[in-house]
Amino acid sequence: MSSTAPLDSKATEQITTAAESKHNETQATRRKRYREAQEQTRNKHLRFQASPTPEEASPELPSDEVAKLPQKRFYRQRAHSNPFSDHNLEYPVLPSQMDWSTIYPHYTPASLRKVEIADIGCGFGGLLIDLGPQFPESLILGMEIRVQVTNYVQDRLIALREIHKADAYNYDNLGVIRGNAMKFLPNFFTKGQLSKMFFCFPDPHFKQRKHKARIITNTLLSEYAYVLREGGVVYTITDVEDLHNWMVKHLDEHPLFERLSKEWEEQDPCVKIMYNSTEEGQKVARNQGSKYVACYKRLPNPDDCE
């Protein structure tokens, strides 16, 4: 009767390494196949739905192609992205040159309204999804710099539109673009176009030398004031108290913004939505962390008050 000789430690290590390599390769292959399939669905959907006239319309997609919500595990991405890097982003030279019908494919260019609400750094789209039904007559845009996260939100919106296509509300007023709001915001929006801007759980950039990359600075606030109409509101929320104090300090010091009261925040429906909708906010709640909110109203330009 023969017996199998025990493997030495080197052979065991080689087998373990080979198994791990095969597992990682399988995961990467699955992720690649999934992304390719989602991209094909995304391109088909946009091409079919963006046709401006019934004569040019293409056949509808089979429901099983788009009705499934995307899975986050196939959209792996770093938590943050350097806003000063060259990301090869596409952006219009002027807002008038932007083709919004590609972002809101159920609207023809003739019927398309202007975007009124912007979620800057929209992440996985939780706030967008909850804001949409509250403002069905307003176009709401998410801006996200990370490519795979943007793709996830696009695929999520495509699936939601298909799932709810027979409902009174079907998420047609929501859109997302990959863009860098710190560089190109005025390329997308005209003066006084927006009524609300949301900054939810932005990158805190803890190191002092990185503070210049924070989404709220004196220079950027002037750009936000340019695209925000008088009486419009800037919403901020974070779980980092130091960042909250930073944002409050800079907004307090800017002449075109005035902080709204705690009573106003308690009554505003957008604050309630912002507090609980984002994936980051839900993670903070699970970890029993604190959330810091500050909302500011856009004041009239000084020249207009004279």
From Swiss-Prot:
Transmembrane segments: none annotated. The active site is at D203. It is an enzyme of class 2 (transferase). Pathway: tRNA modification; N(7)-methylguanine-tRNA biosynthesis. The keyword S-adenosyl-L-methionine applies. It catalyses: guanosine(46) in tRNA + S-adenosyl-L-methionine = N(7)-methylguanosine(46) in tRNA + S-adenosyl-L-homocysteine. S-adenosyl-L-methionine binds at G121, E144, I145, N180, A181, C200, T278, E279, E280. Its EC number is 2.1.1.33. It comes from the Eukaryota. It is found in: Nucleus. GO terms for molecular function: tRNA (guanine(46)-N7)-methyltransferase activity; tRNA binding. Keywords: Methyltransferase, Nucleus, RNA-binding, S-adenosyl-L-methionine, Transferase, tRNA processing, tRNA-binding. Residues 1-65 are annotated as: Disordered. Residues 1-19 have a biased composition (Polar residues). GO terms for cellular component: nucleus; tRNA (m7G46) methyltransferase complex. Belongs to the class I-like SAM-binding methyltransferase superfamily. TrmB family. NCBIfam families: tRNA (guanosine(46)-N7)-methyltransferase TrmB. Catalyzes the formation of N(7)-methylguanine at position 46 (m7G46) in tRNA. Forms a complex with TRM82. This is tRNA (guanine-N(7)-)-methyltransferase. The gene is TRM8.
